[in-house]
Amino acid sequence: MAFLDNPLIILAHIRQSHVTSDDTGMCEMVLIDHDVDLEKLYQSSVSGENSTQMQSNGGETQGYVYSQSVDITSSWDFGIRRRSNTAQKLERLRKERQNQIKCKNVQWKDRNTSHSAEELSSLFERKNFKERALNQGKQSILSVRLEQCPLQLNNPFNEYSKFDGKGHVGTTATKKIDVYLSMQTSQDKLLPMTVVTIANAKVHDLIGLICWQYTTEGREPKLNDNVDAFCLHIAEDDGEVDTDFPPLDSNEPIHKFGFSTLALVEKYSSPGLAAKQSLFVRINAAHGFSLIQVDSTNVTMRDILEKALKRRKGSQRNSGPQYRLEKQSQPNVPVDLDSTLENQNSLEFCLVRENSSRGEEPPEEETQIDIATVQDMLSSHQYKSFKVSMIHRLRFTTDVQLGISGEKVEIDPVTNQKTSTKFWIKQKPISIDSDVLCACDLAEEKSPSHAMFKVTYLSNHDYKHLYFESDAATVNEIVLKVNYILESRASTARADYFAQKQRKLTRRTSFSFQKEKKPG
Protein backbone atom coordinates (compact mmCIF):
# COMPACT_ATOMS: atom_id res chain seq x y z
CA MET A 1 0.00 0.00 0.00
CA ALA A 2 1.29 3.47 -0.92
CA PHE A 3 0.30 6.82 0.54
CA LEU A 4 0.32 9.71 -1.93
CA ASP A 5 -0.35 13.32 -1.11
CA ASN A 6 0.18 14.79 -4.57
CA PRO A 7 -3.17 15.22 -6.43
CA LEU A 8 -1.48 15.40 -9.80
CA ILE A 9 0.05 11.97 -9.43
CA ILE A 10 -3.26 10.53 -8.22
CA LEU A 11 -5.15 12.00 -11.20
CA ALA A 12 -2.56 10.75 -13.67
CA HIS A 13 -2.61 7.29 -12.12
CA ILE A 14 -6.40 7.03 -12.28
CA ARG A 15 -6.48 8.26 -15.86
CA GLN A 16 -3.82 5.82 -17.04
CA SER A 17 -5.44 2.90 -15.16
CA HIS A 18 -8.85 3.35 -16.77
CA VAL A 19 -7.81 4.37 -20.28
CA THR A 20 -7.68 0.75 -21.52
CA SER A 21 -10.87 -0.48 -19.84
CA ASP A 22 -13.24 2.49 -20.07
CA ASP A 23 -14.38 2.90 -23.70
CA THR A 24 -16.81 5.66 -22.86
CA GLY A 25 -14.22 8.11 -21.51
CA MET A 26 -16.25 8.82 -18.39
CA CYS A 27 -13.15 8.58 -16.18
CA GLU A 28 -11.80 11.74 -17.78
CA MET A 29 -15.17 13.47 -17.58
CA VAL A 30 -15.40 12.83 -13.81
CA LEU A 31 -12.00 14.27 -13.00
CA ILE A 32 -11.84 17.06 -15.54
CA ASP A 33 -13.19 19.73 -13.16
CA HIS A 34 -10.55 19.04 -10.53
CA ASP A 35 -7.90 18.90 -13.20
CA VAL A 36 -8.75 22.40 -14.44
CA ASP A 37 -8.69 23.84 -10.93
CA LEU A 38 -5.29 22.37 -10.22
CA GLU A 39 -3.98 23.65 -13.53
CA LYS A 40 -5.05 27.19 -12.70
CA LEU A 41 -3.57 26.86 -9.21
CA TYR A 42 -0.20 25.73 -10.47
CA GLN A 43 -0.07 28.40 -13.19
CA SER A 44 -0.46 31.14 -10.54
CA SER A 45 2.10 29.54 -8.26
CA VAL A 46 4.66 29.11 -11.00
CA SER A 47 4.49 32.78 -12.04
CA GLY A 48 5.32 33.99 -8.42
CA GLU A 49 8.26 31.72 -7.66
CA ASN A 50 11.79 31.80 -8.95
CA SER A 51 13.34 29.41 -11.32
CA THR A 52 15.06 27.43 -8.56
CA GLN A 53 11.79 26.51 -7.01
CA MET A 54 10.46 25.42 -10.39
CA GLN A 55 13.39 23.12 -10.85
CA SER A 56 12.87 21.69 -7.39
CA ASN A 57 9.27 21.02 -8.12
CA GLY A 58 9.99 19.78 -11.63
CA GLY A 59 9.86 16.21 -10.54
CA GLU A 60 6.43 16.72 -9.07
CA THR A 61 4.98 18.62 -12.05
CA GLN A 62 6.41 16.16 -14.53
CA GLY A 63 3.66 13.75 -13.69
CA TYR A 64 1.00 16.33 -14.51
CA VAL A 65 2.60 17.33 -17.80
CA TYR A 66 2.78 13.80 -19.07
CA SER A 67 -0.39 12.62 -17.36
CA GLN A 68 -2.49 13.29 -20.47
CA SER A 69 -2.03 10.73 -23.27
CA VAL A 70 -1.24 12.04 -26.72
CA ASP A 71 -4.07 10.05 -28.38
CA ILE A 72 -6.71 11.11 -25.85
CA THR A 73 -8.38 14.49 -26.29
CA SER A 74 -10.39 15.89 -23.41
CA SER A 75 -13.28 17.43 -25.28
CA TRP A 76 -17.00 16.83 -25.88
CA ASP A 77 -16.42 15.39 -29.38
CA PHE A 78 -14.38 12.45 -28.18
CA GLY A 79 -14.92 9.23 -30.15
CA ILE A 80 -15.80 11.05 -33.41
CA ARG A 81 -13.33 10.55 -36.22
CA ARG A 82 -12.95 13.39 -38.65
CA ARG A 83 -13.34 12.62 -42.34
CA SER A 84 -10.22 12.61 -44.41
CA ASN A 85 -9.64 14.98 -47.29
CA THR A 86 -9.91 12.13 -49.78
CA ALA A 87 -13.40 11.18 -48.60
CA GLN A 88 -14.53 14.80 -48.73
CA LYS A 89 -13.17 15.16 -52.25
CA LEU A 90 -14.91 11.98 -53.44
CA GLU A 91 -18.19 13.20 -51.96
CA ARG A 92 -17.83 16.51 -53.77
CA LEU A 93 -17.11 14.76 -57.09
CA ARG A 94 -20.15 12.52 -56.64
CA LYS A 95 -22.45 15.51 -56.13
CA GLU A 96 -21.01 17.26 -59.18
CA ARG A 97 -21.59 14.14 -61.27
CA GLN A 98 -25.24 13.98 -60.17
CA ASN A 99 -25.72 17.63 -61.05
CA GLN A 100 -24.23 17.03 -64.51
CA ILE A 101 -26.76 14.26 -65.15
CA LYS A 102 -29.61 16.67 -64.49
CA CYS A 103 -28.22 19.19 -66.97
CA LYS A 104 -28.66 18.78 -70.69
CA ASN A 105 -26.10 20.19 -73.11
CA VAL A 106 -27.40 21.48 -76.42
CA GLN A 107 -24.94 22.20 -79.16
CA TRP A 108 -25.60 25.42 -80.96
CA LYS A 109 -25.39 25.30 -84.74
CA ASP A 110 -25.66 28.13 -87.17
CA ARG A 111 -28.53 27.69 -89.62
CA ASN A 112 -27.37 27.31 -93.18
CA THR A 113 -30.66 28.17 -94.89
CA SER A 114 -32.46 31.43 -94.58
CA HIS A 115 -36.13 31.39 -93.54
CA SER A 116 -38.70 33.99 -94.37
CA ALA A 117 -40.50 36.06 -91.77
CA GLU A 118 -43.71 34.08 -92.25
CA GLU A 119 -41.95 30.80 -91.62
CA LEU A 120 -40.29 32.17 -88.52
CA SER A 121 -43.60 33.50 -87.23
CA SER A 122 -45.24 30.11 -87.76
CA LEU A 123 -42.54 28.45 -85.68
CA PHE A 124 -43.09 30.75 -82.73
CA GLU A 125 -46.67 31.86 -83.07
CA ARG A 126 -47.84 34.65 -80.84
CA LYS A 127 -50.72 33.73 -78.59
CA ASN A 128 -53.21 36.01 -76.97
CA PHE A 129 -53.51 34.95 -73.34
CA LYS A 130 -56.06 37.62 -72.50
CA GLU A 131 -58.86 35.92 -74.40
CA ARG A 132 -59.36 32.48 -72.92
CA ALA A 133 -62.13 30.10 -73.85
CA LEU A 134 -64.57 29.12 -71.17
CA ASN A 135 -63.47 25.85 -69.61
CA GLN A 136 -66.35 23.41 -69.71
CA GLY A 137 -65.43 20.90 -67.05
CA LYS A 138 -65.98 17.17 -67.36
CA GLN A 139 -69.23 15.89 -65.94
CA SER A 140 -68.65 14.15 -62.63
CA ILE A 141 -69.63 10.58 -61.91
CA LEU A 142 -72.09 11.78 -59.29
CA SER A 143 -73.92 13.88 -61.89
CA VAL A 144 -74.11 10.92 -64.24
CA ARG A 145 -75.49 8.73 -61.45
CA LEU A 146 -78.08 11.33 -60.54
CA GLU A 147 -79.23 11.49 -64.15
CA GLN A 148 -79.56 7.70 -64.19
CA CYS A 149 -81.43 7.68 -60.89
CA PRO A 150 -84.91 7.54 -62.51
CA LEU A 151 -83.88 4.36 -64.32
CA GLN A 152 -82.75 2.78 -61.07
CA LEU A 153 -86.00 3.68 -59.33
CA ASN A 154 -87.87 1.68 -61.97
CA ASN A 155 -85.67 -1.40 -61.46
CA PRO A 156 -87.95 -4.22 -60.26
CA PHE A 157 -84.99 -5.97 -58.59
CA ASN A 158 -84.00 -3.14 -56.21
CA GLU A 159 -84.58 -5.31 -53.14
CA TYR A 160 -81.61 -7.49 -54.16
CA SER A 161 -79.16 -4.57 -54.42
CA LYS A 162 -78.30 -5.00 -50.73
CA PHE A 163 -76.40 -8.18 -51.65
CA ASP A 164 -73.99 -6.21 -53.85
CA GLY A 165 -70.50 -6.66 -52.40
CA LYS A 166 -68.64 -3.95 -54.35
CA GLY A 167 -68.93 -1.52 -51.44
CA HIS A 168 -67.95 -4.13 -48.84
CA VAL A 169 -64.59 -5.25 -50.24
CA GLY A 170 -62.09 -5.45 -47.37
CA THR A 171 -64.70 -5.18 -44.62
CA THR A 172 -67.01 -8.14 -45.32
CA ALA A 173 -66.39 -11.51 -46.95
CA THR A 174 -67.29 -11.22 -50.64
CA LYS A 175 -67.22 -13.52 -53.67
CA LYS A 176 -66.45 -12.54 -57.27
CA ILE A 177 -68.27 -14.53 -59.96
CA ASP A 178 -68.28 -14.30 -63.76
CA VAL A 179 -71.83 -14.84 -65.02
CA TYR A 180 -72.67 -15.69 -68.64
CA LEU A 181 -76.09 -14.52 -69.77
CA SER A 182 -77.75 -17.00 -72.11
CA MET A 183 -80.64 -14.67 -72.99
CA GLN A 184 -78.42 -12.10 -74.74
CA THR A 185 -77.47 -12.07 -78.41
CA SER A 186 -74.69 -14.23 -79.78
CA GLN A 187 -72.06 -11.47 -79.60
CA ASP A 188 -72.85 -10.26 -76.08
CA LYS A 189 -73.17 -13.83 -74.86
CA LEU A 190 -69.42 -14.40 -75.25
CA LEU A 191 -68.52 -11.79 -72.62
CA PRO A 192 -69.39 -12.54 -68.98
CA MET A 193 -70.77 -10.03 -66.51
CA THR A 194 -68.69 -9.76 -63.33
CA VAL A 195 -70.78 -9.78 -60.16
CA VAL A 196 -69.45 -9.24 -56.61
CA THR A 197 -71.77 -10.57 -53.91
CA ILE A 198 -71.49 -10.95 -50.18
CA ALA A 199 -70.53 -14.45 -49.09
CA ASN A 200 -73.57 -15.15 -46.91
CA ALA A 201 -76.06 -14.56 -49.75
CA LYS A 202 -78.11 -17.49 -51.02
CA VAL A 203 -78.31 -18.65 -54.63
CA HIS A 204 -81.77 -17.09 -54.93
CA ASP A 205 -80.36 -13.75 -53.72
CA LEU A 206 -77.49 -14.00 -56.21
CA ILE A 207 -79.95 -14.53 -59.07
CA GLY A 208 -81.82 -11.39 -57.99
CA LEU A 209 -78.53 -9.45 -57.77
CA ILE A 210 -77.60 -10.55 -61.29
CA CYS A 211 -80.98 -9.42 -62.60
CA TRP A 212 -80.60 -6.10 -60.74
CA GLN A 213 -77.15 -5.42 -62.21
CA TYR A 214 -78.35 -6.55 -65.65
CA THR A 215 -81.22 -4.05 -65.56
CA THR A 216 -79.10 -1.26 -64.06
CA GLU A 217 -76.53 -1.51 -66.85
CA GLY A 218 -79.33 -1.22 -69.42
CA ARG A 219 -78.70 -4.53 -71.14
CA GLU A 220 -81.07 -5.98 -73.71
CA PRO A 221 -83.40 -7.84 -73.91
CA LYS A 222 -85.37 -7.04 -70.80
CA LEU A 223 -85.72 -9.74 -68.17
CA ASN A 224 -88.76 -11.28 -66.63
CA ASP A 225 -89.69 -9.58 -63.35
CA ASN A 226 -90.00 -12.94 -61.59
CA VAL A 227 -86.67 -14.14 -60.16
CA ASP A 228 -88.01 -17.70 -59.84
CA ALA A 229 -88.03 -17.95 -63.64
CA PHE A 230 -84.21 -18.18 -63.69
CA CYS A 231 -81.65 -20.63 -62.38
CA LEU A 232 -77.86 -20.82 -62.16
CA HIS A 233 -75.95 -23.56 -63.96
CA ILE A 234 -72.29 -24.50 -63.89
CA ALA A 235 -70.50 -23.06 -66.95
CA GLU A 236 -67.15 -23.56 -68.61
CA ASP A 237 -64.62 -20.76 -69.00
CA ASP A 238 -65.81 -20.16 -72.58
CA GLY A 239 -69.45 -19.76 -71.48
CA GLU A 240 -70.75 -23.22 -72.44
CA VAL A 241 -73.47 -24.36 -70.05
CA ASP A 242 -72.78 -27.73 -68.44
CA THR A 243 -76.24 -29.30 -68.58
CA ASP A 244 -75.01 -32.67 -67.29
CA PHE A 245 -75.38 -31.31 -63.77
CA PRO A 246 -78.55 -29.92 -62.22
CA PRO A 247 -78.85 -26.20 -61.42
CA LEU A 248 -77.67 -24.89 -58.08
CA ASP A 249 -80.14 -25.20 -55.23
CA SER A 250 -81.68 -21.77 -54.69
CA ASN A 251 -81.90 -22.27 -50.92
CA GLU A 252 -78.20 -23.01 -50.43
CA PRO A 253 -75.65 -20.26 -49.57
CA ILE A 254 -73.37 -19.27 -52.42
CA HIS A 255 -70.18 -19.79 -50.39
CA LYS A 256 -70.97 -23.52 -50.33
CA PHE A 257 -70.14 -23.74 -54.05
CA GLY A 258 -66.61 -23.12 -55.22
CA PHE A 259 -67.44 -22.26 -58.83
CA SER A 260 -66.14 -18.93 -60.15
CA THR A 261 -68.00 -19.15 -63.48
CA LEU A 262 -71.78 -19.60 -63.69
CA ALA A 263 -74.51 -19.10 -66.28
CA LEU A 264 -77.93 -17.51 -65.81
CA VAL A 265 -80.46 -19.67 -67.65
CA GLU A 266 -84.23 -19.41 -67.96
CA LYS A 267 -85.88 -22.49 -66.52
CA TYR A 268 -88.45 -23.10 -69.24
CA SER A 269 -86.81 -21.62 -72.33
CA SER A 270 -83.18 -22.62 -72.14
CA PRO A 271 -81.55 -22.98 -75.57
CA GLY A 272 -78.66 -24.96 -74.08
CA LEU A 273 -80.97 -27.46 -72.47
CA ALA A 274 -83.33 -27.68 -75.41
CA ALA A 275 -80.48 -28.68 -77.68
CA LYS A 276 -79.80 -31.72 -75.52
CA GLN A 277 -83.39 -32.94 -75.35
CA SER A 278 -83.89 -36.20 -77.23
CA LEU A 279 -86.79 -37.71 -79.11
CA PHE A 280 -88.23 -41.13 -78.36
CA VAL A 281 -89.60 -43.36 -81.10
CA ARG A 282 -91.99 -46.11 -80.04
CA ILE A 283 -91.48 -49.48 -81.75
CA ASN A 284 -94.32 -51.96 -81.22
CA ALA A 285 -93.40 -55.63 -81.47
CA ALA A 286 -95.15 -58.94 -80.99
CA HIS A 287 -94.45 -59.12 -77.26
CA GLY A 288 -94.42 -55.53 -76.13
CA PHE A 289 -92.88 -52.27 -77.21
CA SER A 290 -89.63 -50.36 -76.79
CA LEU A 291 -88.61 -46.71 -76.87
CA ILE A 292 -85.72 -45.78 -79.16
CA GLN A 293 -83.86 -42.61 -78.26
CA VAL A 294 -82.74 -40.41 -81.18
CA ASP A 295 -80.95 -37.08 -81.16
CA SER A 296 -82.87 -35.42 -84.00
CA THR A 297 -85.40 -36.09 -86.73
CA ASN A 298 -82.64 -36.31 -89.36
CA VAL A 299 -81.83 -39.90 -88.40
CA THR A 300 -82.61 -42.52 -91.04
CA MET A 301 -85.14 -45.28 -90.51
CA ARG A 302 -82.41 -47.84 -91.12
CA ASP A 303 -80.60 -46.67 -87.98
CA ILE A 304 -83.83 -46.90 -86.01
CA LEU A 305 -84.40 -50.45 -87.27
CA GLU A 306 -80.88 -51.49 -86.25
CA LYS A 307 -81.37 -50.07 -82.77
CA ALA A 308 -84.69 -51.87 -82.46
CA LEU A 309 -83.11 -55.17 -83.51
CA LYS A 310 -80.29 -54.73 -81.00
CA ARG A 311 -82.90 -54.17 -78.35
CA ARG A 312 -84.33 -57.63 -79.11
CA LYS A 313 -81.66 -59.43 -77.06
CA GLY A 314 -78.81 -58.32 -79.27
CA SER A 315 -80.08 -59.74 -82.57
CA GLN A 316 -78.47 -58.31 -85.71
CA ARG A 317 -80.07 -57.49 -89.02
CA ASN A 318 -77.97 -59.90 -91.09
CA SER A 319 -78.42 -62.87 -88.74
CA GLY A 320 -81.63 -64.73 -87.93
CA PRO A 321 -85.08 -63.65 -89.10
CA GLN A 322 -85.38 -60.46 -91.12
CA TYR A 323 -87.68 -57.64 -90.04
CA ARG A 324 -89.13 -54.50 -91.52
CA LEU A 325 -90.74 -51.36 -90.14
CA GLU A 326 -94.30 -50.25 -90.73
CA LYS A 327 -96.21 -47.26 -89.54
CA GLN A 328 -98.63 -48.12 -86.79
CA SER A 329 -101.40 -46.34 -88.68
CA GLN A 330 -100.59 -48.00 -92.05
CA PRO A 331 -100.47 -51.81 -91.78
CA ASN A 332 -98.63 -53.89 -94.42
CA VAL A 333 -96.92 -50.79 -95.89
CA PRO A 334 -93.13 -51.06 -95.45
CA VAL A 335 -91.24 -47.93 -94.55
CA ASP A 336 -88.43 -46.73 -96.80
CA LEU A 337 -85.32 -47.34 -94.72
CA ASP A 338 -83.31 -44.67 -96.56
CA SER A 339 -85.77 -41.93 -95.63
CA THR A 340 -85.49 -39.86 -92.48
CA LEU A 341 -87.74 -39.78 -89.46
CA GLU A 342 -88.82 -36.26 -90.36
CA ASN A 343 -90.38 -37.49 -93.63
CA GLN A 344 -92.53 -40.09 -91.85
CA ASN A 345 -94.60 -37.60 -89.83
CA SER A 346 -94.96 -40.20 -87.10
CA LEU A 347 -93.12 -41.40 -83.99
CA GLU A 348 -94.85 -44.79 -83.64
CA PHE A 349 -93.94 -47.78 -85.79
CA CYS A 350 -94.38 -51.53 -85.79
CA LEU A 351 -91.68 -54.18 -86.17
CA VAL A 352 -92.91 -56.96 -88.51
CA ARG A 353 -91.11 -60.09 -89.66
CA GLU A 354 -90.41 -60.43 -93.38
CA ASN A 355 -92.77 -62.58 -95.50
CA SER A 356 -95.55 -62.10 -92.95
CA SER A 357 -98.24 -59.58 -92.25
CA ARG A 358 -99.35 -57.95 -89.06
CA GLY A 359 -102.56 -60.04 -88.98
CA GLU A 360 -100.70 -63.39 -89.26
CA GLU A 361 -98.69 -62.77 -86.13
CA PRO A 362 -99.96 -64.05 -82.78
CA PRO A 363 -102.51 -61.75 -81.25
CA GLU A 364 -100.95 -59.18 -78.99
CA GLU A 365 -102.60 -57.64 -76.03
CA GLU A 366 -102.84 -53.93 -76.50
CA THR A 367 -100.54 -52.27 -74.05
CA GLN A 368 -102.12 -49.16 -72.70
CA ILE A 369 -99.92 -46.62 -71.02
CA ASP A 370 -101.17 -43.45 -69.50
CA ILE A 371 -99.72 -39.99 -69.89
CA ALA A 372 -98.03 -40.13 -66.48
CA THR A 373 -96.07 -43.23 -67.50
CA VAL A 374 -94.90 -41.57 -70.71
CA GLN A 375 -93.81 -38.51 -68.76
CA ASP A 376 -91.88 -40.71 -66.35
CA MET A 377 -90.14 -42.37 -69.29
CA LEU A 378 -89.18 -39.04 -70.80
CA SER A 379 -88.01 -37.56 -67.51
CA SER A 380 -86.01 -40.64 -66.52
CA HIS A 381 -82.94 -39.32 -68.38
CA GLN A 382 -82.80 -36.20 -66.24
CA TYR A 383 -80.29 -36.22 -63.41
CA LYS A 384 -81.61 -36.99 -59.94
CA SER A 385 -79.80 -37.96 -56.76
CA PHE A 386 -80.92 -40.25 -53.93
CA LYS A 387 -79.44 -40.83 -50.48
CA VAL A 388 -79.25 -44.57 -49.86
CA SER A 389 -77.12 -47.04 -47.90
CA MET A 390 -74.67 -49.30 -49.70
CA ILE A 391 -74.43 -52.85 -48.30
CA HIS A 392 -70.93 -54.37 -48.00
CA ARG A 393 -69.82 -57.78 -46.95
CA LEU A 394 -70.64 -58.86 -43.40
CA ARG A 395 -73.73 -56.64 -43.73
CA PHE A 396 -71.85 -53.40 -43.06
CA THR A 397 -73.54 -50.36 -44.61
CA THR A 398 -72.22 -47.04 -45.86
CA ASP A 399 -74.30 -43.96 -46.59
CA VAL A 400 -73.81 -42.88 -50.22
CA GLN A 401 -75.38 -40.49 -52.68
CA LEU A 402 -76.69 -42.29 -55.76
CA GLY A 403 -76.87 -39.99 -58.79
CA ILE A 404 -78.78 -41.33 -61.81
CA SER A 405 -78.92 -39.77 -65.28
CA GLY A 406 -79.36 -41.02 -68.81
CA GLU A 407 -75.60 -41.27 -69.34
CA LYS A 408 -74.23 -42.75 -66.12
CA VAL A 409 -74.86 -43.82 -62.54
CA GLU A 410 -72.59 -42.20 -59.94
CA ILE A 411 -72.02 -43.42 -56.38
CA ASP A 412 -70.41 -40.82 -54.11
CA PRO A 413 -69.71 -41.47 -50.41
CA VAL A 414 -71.21 -39.11 -47.87
CA THR A 415 -68.57 -37.41 -45.70
CA ASN A 416 -68.30 -37.61 -41.90
CA GLN A 417 -69.56 -41.15 -41.58
CA LYS A 418 -69.25 -42.68 -38.14
CA THR A 419 -69.99 -46.23 -39.29
CA SER A 420 -67.30 -46.34 -41.96
CA THR A 421 -64.59 -45.02 -39.65
CA LYS A 422 -65.64 -47.45 -36.94
CA PHE A 423 -65.30 -50.58 -39.06
CA TRP A 424 -62.45 -49.30 -41.26
CA ILE A 425 -64.59 -49.21 -44.40
CA LYS A 426 -63.73 -46.40 -46.80
CA GLN A 427 -66.04 -46.26 -49.80
CA LYS A 428 -64.53 -44.90 -53.00
CA PRO A 429 -66.54 -43.02 -55.65
CA ILE A 430 -67.88 -45.25 -58.44
CA SER A 431 -69.08 -44.16 -61.87
CA ILE A 432 -70.97 -46.68 -64.04
CA ASP A 433 -71.63 -45.81 -67.67
CA SER A 434 -75.11 -46.62 -68.96
CA ASP A 435 -73.65 -48.73 -71.78
CA VAL A 436 -72.23 -51.25 -69.28
CA LEU A 437 -75.27 -51.16 -66.98
CA CYS A 438 -77.13 -54.46 -67.26
CA ALA A 439 -80.00 -54.61 -64.77
CA CYS A 440 -81.58 -53.08 -61.70
CA ASP A 441 -83.84 -55.42 -59.73
CA LEU A 442 -85.74 -55.28 -56.47
CA ALA A 443 -84.05 -57.72 -54.06
CA GLU A 444 -86.45 -57.67 -51.13
CA GLU A 445 -89.09 -55.46 -49.56
CA LYS A 446 -89.65 -56.25 -45.89
CA SER A 447 -91.62 -53.19 -44.86
CA PRO A 448 -92.45 -49.69 -46.12
CA SER A 449 -89.39 -48.41 -44.27
CA HIS A 450 -86.90 -51.00 -45.53
CA ALA A 451 -86.24 -52.44 -48.99
CA MET A 452 -83.22 -53.63 -51.00
CA PHE A 453 -82.34 -53.46 -54.69
CA LYS A 454 -79.48 -54.80 -56.78
CA VAL A 455 -77.55 -53.08 -59.59
CA THR A 456 -75.69 -55.29 -62.08
CA TYR A 457 -73.00 -53.92 -64.41
CA LEU A 458 -70.18 -55.24 -66.61
CA SER A 459 -66.60 -54.68 -65.42
CA ASN A 460 -63.55 -56.31 -67.06
CA HIS A 461 -65.64 -59.02 -68.79
CA ASP A 462 -67.29 -59.93 -65.50
CA TYR A 463 -70.69 -59.07 -64.07
CA LYS A 464 -70.59 -57.34 -60.69
CA HIS A 465 -73.45 -56.70 -58.30
CA LEU A 466 -74.01 -53.80 -55.92
CA TYR A 467 -76.65 -53.90 -53.19
CA PHE A 468 -78.37 -50.87 -51.69
CA GLU A 469 -81.11 -50.33 -49.12
CA SER A 470 -83.51 -47.53 -48.30
CA ASP A 471 -87.22 -47.02 -47.75
CA ALA A 472 -89.60 -48.82 -50.11
CA ALA A 473 -90.79 -45.68 -51.93
CA THR A 474 -87.25 -44.55 -52.76
CA VAL A 475 -86.18 -48.03 -53.85
CA ASN A 476 -89.17 -48.46 -56.17
CA GLU A 477 -88.53 -45.04 -57.71
CA ILE A 478 -84.85 -45.88 -58.34
CA VAL A 479 -85.63 -49.28 -59.86
CA LEU A 480 -88.31 -47.80 -62.14
CA LYS A 481 -86.06 -44.91 -63.24
CA VAL A 482 -83.09 -47.16 -64.06
CA ASN A 483 -85.27 -49.64 -65.95
CA TYR A 484 -86.77 -46.83 -68.03
CA ILE A 485 -83.25 -45.75 -68.96
CA LEU A 486 -82.22 -49.31 -69.83
CA GLU A 487 -85.33 -49.82 -71.97
CA SER A 488 -84.64 -46.68 -74.00
CA ARG A 489 -80.99 -47.53 -74.73
CA ALA A 490 -79.55 -50.19 -77.03
CA SER A 491 -76.94 -51.74 -74.74
CA THR A 492 -74.96 -54.76 -75.93
CA ALA A 493 -73.86 -55.55 -72.38
CA ARG A 494 -77.48 -55.74 -71.24
CA ALA A 495 -78.42 -58.01 -74.16
CA ASP A 496 -75.49 -60.35 -73.45
CA TYR A 497 -76.38 -60.43 -69.76
CA PHE A 498 -79.96 -61.52 -70.45
CA ALA A 499 -78.79 -64.04 -73.06
CA GLN A 500 -76.38 -65.58 -70.56
CA LYS A 501 -79.09 -65.57 -67.92
CA GLN A 502 -81.48 -67.31 -70.31
CA ARG A 503 -78.88 -69.97 -71.15
CA LYS A 504 -78.32 -70.68 -67.45
CA LEU A 505 -82.06 -70.96 -66.91
CA THR A 506 -82.43 -73.33 -69.88
CA ARG A 507 -79.52 -75.48 -68.70
CA ARG A 508 -80.99 -75.67 -65.21
CA THR A 509 -84.42 -76.58 -66.55
CA SER A 510 -83.06 -79.37 -68.78
CA PHE A 511 -80.98 -80.75 -65.91
CA SER A 512 -83.99 -80.89 -63.59
CA PHE A 513 -86.08 -82.51 -66.35
CA GLN A 514 -83.49 -85.27 -66.86
CA LYS A 515 -83.29 -85.80 -63.11
CA GLU A 516 -87.04 -86.30 -62.89
CA LYS A 517 -87.03 -88.59 -65.92
CA LYS A 518 -84.50 -91.12 -64.54
CA PRO A 519 -86.75 -92.79 -61.91
CA GLY A 520 -89.39 -93.50 -64.52
From Swiss-Prot:
One of its GO terms (molecular function) is enzyme-substrate adaptor activity. It holds the Pfam family SIN1_PH. Residues 139-267 form the CRIM domain. The keyword Ion transport does not apply. Keywords: Cell membrane, Cytoplasm, Endoplasmic reticulum, Endosome, Golgi apparatus, Lysosome, Membrane, Mitochondrion, Mitochondrion outer membrane, Nucleus. GO terms for biological process: TORC2 signaling. Residues 382-487 form the SIN1-type PH domain. Residues 279-353 are annotated as: SIN1-type RBD. Gene3D superfamilies: Pleckstrin-homology domain (PH domain)/Phosphotyrosine-binding domain (PTB). GO terms for cellular component: early endosome; early endosome membrane; endoplasmic reticulum; endoplasmic reticulum membrane; Golgi membrane; late endosome; late endosome membrane; lysosomal membrane. Residues 310-333 are annotated as: Disordered. The CRIM domain forms a ubiquitin-like fold with a characteristic acidic loop, which recognizes and binds AGC protein kinase family members substrates. The SIN1-type PH binds phosphatidylinositol 3,4,5-trisphosphate (PI(3,4,5)P3). It plays a dual role in mTORC2: in absence of PI(3,4,5)P3, it binds and inactivates MTOR. PI(3,4,5)P3-binding relieves the inhibition, leading to mTORC2 activation. Component of the mechanistic target of rapamycin complex 2 (mTORC2), consisting in two heterotretramers composed of MTOR, MLST8, RICTOR and MAPKAP1/SIN1. Contrary to mTORC1, mTORC2 does not bind to and is not sensitive to FKBP12-rapamycin. Component of the mechanistic target of rapamycin complex 2 (mTORC2), which transduces signals from growth factors to pathways involved in proliferation, cytoskeletal organization, lipogenesis and anabolic output. In response to growth factors, mTORC2 phosphorylates and activates AGC protein kinase family members, including AKT (AKT1, AKT2 and AKT3), PKC (PRKCA, PRKCB and PRKCE) and SGK1. In contrast to mTORC1, mTORC2 is nutrient-insensitive. This is Target of rapamycin complex 2 subunit MAPKAP1. It comes from Xenopus tropicalis (Western clawed frog).
